[in-house]
Amino acid sequence: MSEKDNQGHRERIREKFFNNGIDGFAEYEILELLLTYCIPRKDTKPIAKELLNKFKSLDNVFKASFDKLSTIDGLGKNSITFLKLLGELPSIIYKDELKNKKLIDKETLKISNKDILLKYLRNKIGYEEIEKFYVIYLSSSNEVIEFEENSVGTLDRSSVYPREIYKKVINLNAKSIILAHNHPSDNITPSKSDIELTNEIAKGLKNFGALLIEHIIITKNSYFSFLEEGLI
């Protein structure tokens, strides 16, 4: 495709979006359109199709690692950064939503905005290829004080230090916490060490007047709730 023809094609797909929105776009056309904003003077359709052929879905494209995206011919540092930034936007939006809501029902001590929480966790760590352990610290009014990436591990484990969590609870004057970690294997079944760690932290928090409300294992396809399964 000549540069003139390519420019005309870009304008046509942009015009299609301006007139009709995203409805009617194939997944590769969405990627093609996005890539026109970070890849100048180049036909982005083949790149978009190769991305979907390799990663199978838009979600997987946006959550793919820098190294994996680097294997796609035509993608450079700028375009990969652009795609990675797009992949982070949902978790930022969901995090902001959670900040403005009471996360725990005071009467039942259950999570009152679990759908948003699960969307946040799935977008933040559900697609990661190594285990990451998150702690959400809550105030006495059940509002989020802080989201913390507590530890980063390997493919099947992360090193979590309960003392560091207790120290943070004291410093923040948190009254409850929610734990979450991902399983890169996509198997949501808790391991023996997951259960033991959960029990240890729940017991230890009581010494500081705080509660463990929930522990969630998240993957890109599902989740496991310790609370729902009666393990807390």
UniProtKB/Swiss-Prot annotation:
Motif (JAMM motif): 181-194
GO MF: metal ion binding; metallopeptidase activity
Pfam families: RadC, UPF0758_N
GO terms for biological process, alphabetical: proteolysis
Residues that bind Zn(2+): H181, H183, D194
PROSITE patterns reported in the protein's UniProt record: MPN
Protein name stated in the entry: UPF0758 protein FN0909
Annotated PANTHER family: DNA REPAIR PROTEIN RADC, UPF0758 PROTEIN YEES-RELATED
Keyword annotations of the record: Hydrolase, Metal-binding, Metalloprotease, Protease, Zinc
MPN domain segment(s): 110-232
Similarity annotation: Belongs to the UPF0758 family.
